[in-house]
Each structure stands twice: as C-alpha cells, then as structure tokens.
Regions:
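Bacterial N-terminal signal peptides
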Residues: 7-14
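Extracellular carbohydrate-recognition regions
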Residues: 20-56, 243-257
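Flexible glycan-contacting loops in extracellular carbohydrate-active proteins
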Residues: 201-240
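Short strand-turn-strand beta-turns centered on an Asx-Gly dipeptide
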Residues: 190-196
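Positively charged n-region of N-terminal signal peptides that target proteins for export
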Residues: 1-4
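Secretory/extracellular carbohydrate-interaction modules
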Residues: 43-47, 53-152
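Short tryptophan-centered beta-strand motifs in secreted/extracellular beta-sheet-rich domains
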Residues: 173-182, 188-190
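Short, aromatic/His-centered strand-loop micro-motif at the edge of beta-sheets
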Residues: 22, 152-178
Length: 257
C-alpha cells in the first residue's frame, strides 16, 4: 500500500512539474532597491506577475525591480563592481537555443519631457567568469523616440552591433521584443514585432545563468502627457512567447516553444 501511495504522489508531482510556469521572481524589497545608492527609487506602482506598469504624471519618478535573491548577493559583496561577477539566479540550458520576450506599451507623447526604460536588463556570468548583459532600452524625448538593443560585456572578445528601432504601429498597441540566445554558437538574436532581425552579437563563452532587472523613469512632462500608461512585461514561459524563433528554440526553463 505504501508503494502505491508513493507512486501516486510521485505521479502527481510529475504532472505538476509539467504544468509549472516558467517565471522569475522580482521580489526585492524597497530597502534593498534603495541600498543600491538611489534613495528616491520606488517599486513599480502596479505589479502583476512579471508585468510592471505605471501612469505618467508631471512629477518625476523612478521605478526599479530586481529579484531578492540576486540583489541580496550583490549587496553582500559590498563592491560597486559586484554585478560583474555575481551569478544570475536563473540557471539556463547550456545547449540549443533559448528565448524570452518583452511586451512593452509606450505612450504617445508630445515633444516635452522624457520617458525612459533604461534598462530592461537580462545578464549573467559566462562560463569563463566574465559578465554579459542583454540590454533593451527605450527613450522618448524632445528629439528621440526609439528602442535600443545592445549586448555588453567586460570581456573584450564580445562582438556586438546592436539596433536602434522606432516603435511601430501594432494591432494591440504593444511593442514585442524577443531575445534568443544560441548556446551552441554563442550568439544572440532579435525578433522585433514579428520580424526576425537575425544575430547581432557573439559572446565568447557559454552562458549558464541569468538575472533580470528593470528600471524606468520620467520627468519634465507636459500636462497633456500626464496619466499615460507605460508597461513592461517579461514573457518567459513558452505558453506566453508569441513570436517565431529558429526551429527547436525553448524557453529559459528548457521547454520547447
């Protein structure tokens, strides 16, 4: 009887793991976030799962999000360079292609003031001990309205070109940015609003971990630009990733798209 019960429990455990959603916990406390050095930073006003949103105003605000586990280790190092060697808290498959997406709503604004997403960041430590960062940024200002996608590293062997892309008119009003990482060739590619832009960077060593963070702010907005919606959502689970990627691509938890 005990064996039957044990087998039943194990069976249910297997079923639950199959349906477990691939997520990331942005649960850092306000105290931790402000310990990074900016005491004016706040948590995002609205957080639902991995979606962060706020409404603009004529005041100046800055919001940020990290995971508690990652930030705790960064702060414990007591070193301004800690992010160059602190491993991410999401372990990655080290072969094949993995992908994740950002679903972003940016407001239509006049030519006064700024709204920034800088950055929506994914980064980690490569197997050679060096850091690599995949940066998605956005700025709306008096003379600019663009997304910036770039890869950076403290390893000089990194080769990166990057993209400067204007928001597009889409059917649902959201901008969709997909990052795919080829662990076989050590390359990173971009899909922007359904169009595969191809590989834009080559990093020198496999990446076996990631962390995610997000910062956004606005300032000097006109009264007509107040009360506009801004949102950034991380799409990590295969069921939420909607764009097309190279054959065999998986989500960051290793589940096929």
């Amino acid at each position: 009887v005990k064996n039957i019960i044990l087998a039943t429990i194990m069976g249910f455990s297997g079923i639950s793991s199959v349906f477990a959603e691939c997520t990331y916990s942005f649960d850092a406390t306000l105290t931790q976030l402000q310990s990074l050095g900016n005491t004016s930073v706040q948590k995002f006003p609205t957080i639902i799962g991995n979606k962060f949103s706020y409404k603009t105003s004529q005041q100046s605000s800055i919001y940020t999000a990290f995971s508690q586990d990652y930030l705790k280790r960064v702060l414990a190092a007591n070193d301004s360079q800690a992010m160059l060697y602190t491993r991410g808290d999401k372990i990655l498959p080290t072969t094949g292609i993995i992908a994740f997406e950002y679903k972003i709503k940016v407001p239509t604004l006049g030519n006064t003031g700024y709204v920034n997403i800088f950055p929506a960041l994914s980064g980690g430590i490569m197997q050679n001990g060096k850091a690599v960062n995949f940066i998605v940024a956005y700025q709306h200002g008096p003379t600019t309205n663009n997304f910036y996608i770039q890869t950076t590293s403290n390893d000089s062997a990194l080769i990166s070109n990057g993209f400067n892309l204007a928001p597009e008119v889409t059917s649902d009003g959201y901008q969709k940015i997909g990052i795919y990482i080829n662990q076989n060739s050590n390359q990173v590619g971009l899909v922007f609003n359904g169009v595969n832009k191809g590989y834009f960077a080559t990093f020198p060593s496999k990446l076996d971990n990631l962390y995610f963070s997000l910062t956004s702010n606005y300032f000097d907005l006109a009264a007509t630009d107040a009360n506009k919606d801004v949102s950034i959502e991380y799409l990590l689970d295969q069921s939420k990733i909607t764009q097309t990627y190279p054959t065999g691509t998986k989500d960051i938890c290793g589940v096929a798209l």
